[in-house]
């Protein structure tokens, strides 16, 4: 079934005679795609019949002609084929193309892993983004191991997983796909006999048939705790093992290994974070009960991991007392062990480990978590993870002191590091809520306690005075004699649960309280007062939690420096920051700022906000930690993490960074252990590079800043002019995209809109970006750039394109901005988008708006290529270019089918099968694009 493997005209292999490794990798990728395509084709024919397979192939070939040549005859043929299909056949066709996208992604991912391995085993020079490269750079700059260890003592690199609903695949589907990936990996790594090759292919066939017979779509809506459980899967896949391994590898490189003194050990700097189960902004289903359940699920996952590792460690530490000496600490642990087996009487390390296991099992039982294996006897629960770690450290010291350090460097070392990184809470859970909810809650409490306050009517200065007075007061603001609204009761219940979590799991369990849509100083003080009510802040100025403003809109980004300047000048708030080690975190929102002002202006205002915040924090003597709320798509701040971090203005990283990992990006980065390790290494290397090796980077020349300011203003005008100022644009958007149908997918627990309106302002950023990706316009990732470049060149004929090209070559920020736009535009298709435009019933509106979009697209591509000095999109990114050419012949038909189904769905009586077909196309297109939300 070779016709269902590659595009009709096979892509030419790269002409790299001097690069045999790259050529071999390319060949192997094509072979893997051929293999999986053949197996899928056989599956479609066997399960659905030859007629369905022939239909798939006919649609694919016609779609290629239309896409490649803009062939109007092919377009008519395609429409005729689609019109003639039954609803049942349509669903089968969609599933075939969707699964090919999934399988092509697997082959690509395995090829990336293959190339990473080749780079490591062949002894080639380390590439940018690898720690080896960054450490070599540091050595060349005269930065030694001791200085680097000092850096990591206060460093923080924290990927924060969120449940943003952009991962459309079910976990069952992902599990099967991981099985297929493992089988491909086996073919790569293991020297198989002919019989084993046959067995491997048979297993692949079973997996693909199982995939074909598995529901692609969720039949029920996810609950928040479902999302929590899904998120925890990535700890099993990657984090629980790779986070400790990365620390240990870096420690070895810096000389803090086996026999190192305590002060030479590398501090744990890589900390996992999560919003899943703690993000209440717009999600009424995140309650105190859900917060409690989330923390319990997280703790259960990490304690079971520790117990499993202790069980294995006990098996390994069979050292006999007459063959190895032990320390007094280990002797005491062995004597306290409830393990009285005569077989282990002379195996003190095993006795010590079984005692630790018993104590940890008792800890799990105290937290109402069932352990995997019953302990050998009863023991006292650990009061904290520090006590658990102290016992592990005692075993480590004894082994090292008695010539068994090589044993200490195995499983025990990894477990000690895991305990340090994950504690008993696994990941730090952020709480997040909208500032408007805090405002209403405080207003109700204030009006009950101070009836004359009229909190909602008074100005910002009066609010600040009232709130700071409350922070100084030891008297509670709430009263058991007042009946509060359900919203206020719910908010206070969540905060009380957070305080209880600190007592149960430690302060690291919930270290941040984030305020979305922060617009003023009072927004932060309101949260401080609420936290004081539950004991997380006391009147003396000590705080057990960080209060984090989130600046999201263009206007709020522009005001962020002034807000933080005034806030840090308030003694009551400054004391809270000082009690937290003099560190203040600020979160920057990439998604809403993009929806508000467009891609160019969002990127520029974020950059300027960082520069302003750096200056303000230096003035106040406070350490700034930035938390980047980036999405998967470029329209929501996505793009290569290394480039994004290194392109930050000088002083923005300063050793600490937090960054969101959302939706389908979590899966692509962390479902495979090797890929996950590589991505964690990239974050670490970029943080080190931006902090130590580029701290005094020369600021961009004034001309560049001025040009960027002008480009931003021009792009802003074009973007706002289309999205917010064009009559009928809202109608065009709702008619020409799948925004309505997206809400029928069971991909998340959160509603798509903040309010029940059709206004763009009220729409969440994710469905906004997701919808434009589905219709292949990707408008949030580029619109306005072309107009801005044309207008700027017209206003500066003396500088023109050469000046902008110098700006691109010399300024990392501008280079990263354009590189991301290059990626977005390469995935767009005006031909396909024109078919979605035909769904708009008003022909005049359709012609006017799509005409503007088409003209802006051409202007943006022309401007981008001129500035980059390229002849075509992705000229500087051959890997992505190749990827798109492999996958898109199977992606484009899904768009054509989706348009046809949308037309039927919107013009006929409701049909469950047609709606299911639309949902399947959304799934398949999302998989093909890879970062669509």
Swiss-Prot record:
Do you know which InterPro entries this protein is assigned to? PEP_COase (IPR021135), PEP_COase_bac/pln-type (IPR022805), PEP_COase_Lys_AS (IPR018129), PEPCASE_His_AS (IPR033129), Pyrv/PenolPyrv_kinase-like_dom (IPR015813)
Which keywords label this protein? Carbon dioxide fixation, Lyase, Magnesium
Which catalytic reaction applies to this protein?
A: oxaloacetate + phosphate = phosphoenolpyruvate + hydrogencarbonate
Annotated GO biological process: carbon fixation; oxaloacetate metabolic process; tricarboxylic acid cycle
Note the superkingdom of the native organism: Bacteria
Cofactor(s) the protein requires to work = Mg(2+)
Q: What is its EC number?
A: 4.1.1.31
PROSITE patterns cross-referenced by the UniProt entry: PEPCASE_1, PEPCASE_2
Matches recorded under Pfam families: PEPcase
Q: Which GO terms describe its cellular component?
A: cytosol
Active site positions, chain numbering: 164, 595
The kind of enzyme this is, by top-level EC class, is lyase
SUPFAM superfamilies linked to this entry = Phosphoenolpyruvate/pyruvate domain
One Gene Ontology term of the molecular function aspect: phosphoenolpyruvate carboxylase activity
Give the matching NCBIfam families.
PRK00009.1
Query: What PANTHER family is this protein classified in?
Result: PHOSPHOENOLPYRUVATE CARBOXYLASE (PTHR30523:SF6)
Q: What HAMAP family does the record point to?
A: PEPcase_type1
Family designation: Belongs to the PEPCase type 1 family.
- Functional note: Forms oxaloacetate, a four-carbon dicarboxylic acid source for the tricarboxylic acid cycle.
Q: What is this protein called?
A: Phosphoenolpyruvate carboxylase
């Amino acid at each position: 079934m070779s016709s269902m493997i590659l595009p009709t005209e096979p892509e030419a292999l790269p002409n790299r005679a001097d690069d045999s490794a790259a050529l071999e990798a390319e060949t192997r990728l094509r072979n893997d795609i051929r293999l999986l395509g053949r197996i899928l084709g056989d599956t479609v024919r066997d399960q659905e019949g030859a007629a369905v397979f022939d239909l798939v192939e006919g649609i694919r070939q016609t779609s290629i002609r239309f896409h490649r040549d803009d062939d109007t005859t092919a377009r008519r043929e395609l429409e005729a084929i689609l019109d003639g299909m039954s609803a049942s056949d349509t669903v089968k066709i969609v599933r075939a193309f969707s699964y090919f996208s999934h399988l092509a992604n697997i082959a690509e991912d395995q090829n990336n892993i293959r190339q990473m391995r080749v780079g490591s085993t062949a002894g080639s020079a380390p590439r940018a983004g690898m720690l080896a490269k960054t450490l070599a750079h540091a050595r060349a700059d005269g930065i030694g191991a001791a200085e680097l260890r000092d850096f990591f003592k206060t460093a923080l690199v924290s990927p924060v997983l969120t449940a943003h609903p952009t991962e459309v695949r079910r976990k069952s589907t992902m599990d099967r796909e991981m099985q297929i990936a493992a089988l491909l990996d086996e073919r790569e790594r293991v020297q198989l006999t002919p019989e084993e090759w046959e067995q491997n292919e048979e297993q692949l066939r079973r997996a693909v048939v199982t995939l074909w017979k598995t529901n692609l779509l969720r039949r029920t809506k996810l609950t928040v705790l479902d999302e929590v459980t899904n998120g925890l899967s990535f700890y099993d896949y990657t984090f629980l093992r790779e986070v400790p391994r990365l620390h240990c590898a870096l420690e070895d490189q810096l000389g803090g290994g086996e026999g190192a003194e305590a002060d030479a050990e590398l501090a744990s700097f890589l900390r996992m974070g999560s919003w899943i189960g703690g993000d209440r902004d717009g999600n009424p289903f995140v309650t105190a009960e859900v917060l409690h359940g989330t923390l319990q699920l997280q703790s259960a996952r990490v304690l079971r991991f520790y117990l499993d590792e202790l069980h294995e460690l006990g098996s390994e530490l069979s050292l006999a007392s007459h063959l190895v000496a032990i320390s007094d600490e280990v002797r005491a642990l062995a004597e306290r062990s409830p393990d009285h087996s005569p077989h282990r009487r002379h195996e003190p390390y095993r006795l010590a480990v079984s005692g630790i296991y018993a104590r940890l099992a008792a800890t799990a039982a105290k937290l109402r978590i069932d352990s995997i294996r019953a302990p050998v006897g009863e023991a006292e629960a650990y009061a904290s993870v520090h006590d658990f770690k102290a016992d592990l450290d005692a075993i480590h010291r004894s082994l090292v002191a008695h010539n068994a350090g090589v044993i200490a460097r195995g499983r025990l070392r990894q477990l000690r590091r895991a305990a340090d990184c994950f504690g008993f809470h696994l990941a730090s859970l952020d709480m997040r809520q909208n500032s408007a909810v805090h405002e209403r809650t405080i207003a109700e409490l204030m009006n009950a306690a101070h009836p004359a306050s009229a909190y909602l009517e008074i100005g910002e200065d009066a609010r600040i005075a009232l709130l700071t007075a409350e922070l100084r007061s030891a008297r509670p603001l709430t009263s058991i004699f007042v009946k509060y609204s359900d919203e206020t009761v719910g908010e206070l219940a969540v905060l009380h649960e957070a305080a209880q979590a600190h007592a149960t799991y430690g302060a690291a369990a919930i270290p941040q309280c984030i305020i979305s849509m922060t617009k003023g100083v009072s927004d932060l003080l309101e949260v401080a007062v609420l936290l004081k009510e539950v004991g997380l802040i006391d009147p003396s100025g000590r705080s057990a939690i960080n209060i984090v403003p989130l600046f999201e809109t263009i206007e709020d980004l522009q005001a962020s420096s002034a807000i933080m300047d005034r806030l840090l000048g308030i003694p009551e708030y400054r004391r809270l920051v000082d009690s937290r080690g003099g560190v203040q975190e600020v979160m920057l929102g990439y998604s809403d700022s993009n929806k508000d002002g467009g891609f160019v202006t969002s990127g520029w205002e974020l950059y300027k906000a960082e520069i302003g915040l750096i200056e303000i924090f230096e003035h106040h003597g406070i350490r700034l930690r930035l938390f980047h709320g980036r999405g998967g798509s470029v329209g929501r701040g996505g793009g290569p993490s290394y480039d994004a971090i290194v392109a930050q203005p000088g002083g923005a990283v300063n050793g600490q960074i937090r960054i969101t990992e959302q939706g389908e990006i979590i899966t692509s980065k962390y479902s495979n252990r090797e890929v996950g390790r590589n991505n964690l290494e990239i974050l670490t290397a970029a943080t080190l590079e931006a902090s130590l090796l580029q701290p005094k980077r020369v600021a961009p020349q004034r001309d560049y800043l001025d040009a960027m300011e002008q480009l931003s203003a021009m792009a802003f005008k074009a973007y706002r002019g289309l999205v917010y100022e064009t009559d009928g644009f809202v109608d065009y958007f709702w008619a020409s995209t799948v925004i309505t149908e997206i809400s029928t997918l069971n991909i998340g627990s959160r509603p798509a809109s903040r309010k029940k309106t059709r206004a763009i302002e009220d729409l969440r950023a994710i469905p906004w970006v997701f919808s434009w990706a589905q219709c292949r316009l990707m408008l949030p990732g580029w619109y306005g750039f072309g107009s801005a470049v044309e207008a700027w060149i017209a206003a500066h004929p003396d500088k023109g394109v050469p000046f902008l090209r110098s700006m691109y070559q010399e300024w990392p920020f501008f280079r990263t901005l354009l590189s991301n736009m290059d990626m977005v535009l390469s995935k767009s298709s005006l031909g396909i988008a024109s078919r979605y435009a035909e769904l708009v019933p008003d022909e005049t509106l359709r012609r006017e708006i799509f005409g503007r979009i088409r003209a802006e697209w051409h202007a943006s591509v022309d401007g981008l290529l001129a500035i980059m000095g390229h002849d075509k999109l992705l000229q500087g990114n051959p890997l992505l270019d190749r990827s798109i050419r492999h996958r898109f012949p199977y992606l484009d038909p899904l768009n054509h089918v989706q348009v046809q189904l949308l037309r039927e769905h919107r013009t006929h009586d409701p049909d469950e099968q047609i709606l299911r077909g639309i949902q399947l196309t959304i799934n398949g297109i999302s998989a093909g694009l890879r970062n669509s939300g």
